[in-house]
Amino acid sequence: MFNTAVKILYRSLIELTNHRLSSYLIKGFCESKISKPVIPLFSKHFRLNWDDVDGTAADYGSLSELFIRQINLERRPVSKEAHAVVSPVDGVVQTVGIINPNQTFTVKGKDYSFAELTGCKSADHQYNGGYFVVLYLSPRHYHRFHSPISCRYQKLAELGNRSYPVNQLGLKYGKDVLSKNYRFVYELNSGSRNVLMIPVGAMNINSIVQTNTRTELEIGEELGYFSFGSTVILVFEKDAFQPSAHLAEGQEVQVGELIGYEE
């Protein structure tokens, strides 16, 4: 009863604040020089790690510039192990699981539709029974996403037009946020296997930008960025991925870090 009441209140508050005007105003503020004085407060509140960044808070002209900051990728060595799959982002592992036979996957006790998430309507596809990994980027994390494998890739779909919070509260009390939010669906082909990589937008700023125009990517190569903290979902074919021993809910991971192996 209590959880139901909290869920209704949470969704109502989100709907009241999540519309085009508020998104426009927040985005405009973050991109303007007016937001520059907020950077030190933001950095302190979210405990940004400046050791990985060339420069200081004073070098950024706006919050938006800070969100999409570059980092020294020499501090993110890409795993050289054979058949390695690496983390595409700096973030936190929210869930590791397997796509269910009924075409759903479960995150934080909620069932999501694989078809709705990916736009794949066929019930007969190679991802049935495969692993999925959900990685959450908080506002403090580096906001760029990279390729988890060496591959050829294509963008299969651009879905959703609004976004809701993808943090712990959003997953617990929101309504199917991972399969409703604005998102891209990429298919990565390593030559023998396919992997789906799905960057999912976050509330208000709701922006995903692809920076790489090449059709082939090296493992760890940048593909794009978010304009605010968000989520990346990886989906593997059945019997095509073996998670590493440390890949567990709540684990912090970094770009280039080993998260498993292609099989």
Swiss-Prot record:
InterPro entries: PS_Dcarbxylase, PSD-B, PSD_type1_pro. GO terms for biological process: phosphatidylethanolamine biosynthetic process. Its cofactor is pyruvate. The active site is at residues 90, 146, 230. It is a peripheral membrane protein. GO terms for cellular component: plasma membrane. The modification Pyruvic acid (Ser) is found at residue 230. Keywords: Cell membrane, Decarboxylase, Lipid biosynthesis, Lipid metabolism, Lyase, Membrane, Phospholipid biosynthesis, Phospholipid metabolism, Pyruvate, Zymogen. Its main location: membrane. Is synthesized initially as an inactive proenzyme. Formation of the active enzyme involves a self-maturation process in which the active site pyruvoyl group is generated from an internal serine residue via an autocatalytic post-translational modification. Two non-identical subunits are generated from the proenzyme in this reaction, and the pyruvate is formed at the N-terminus of the alpha chain, which is derived from the carboxyl end of the proenzyme. Its EC number is 4.1.1.65. Belongs to the phosphatidylserine decarboxylase family. PSD-B subfamily. Prokaryotic type I sub-subfamily. Catalyzes the formation of phosphatidylethanolamine (PtdEtn) from phosphatidylserine (PtdSer). PANTHER family: PHOSPHATIDYLSERINE DECARBOXYLASE, PHOSPHATIDYLSERINE DECARBOXYLASE PROENZYME, MITOCHONDRIAL. Heterodimer of a large membrane-associated beta subunit and a small pyruvoyl-containing alpha subunit. This is Phosphatidylserine decarboxylase proenzyme.
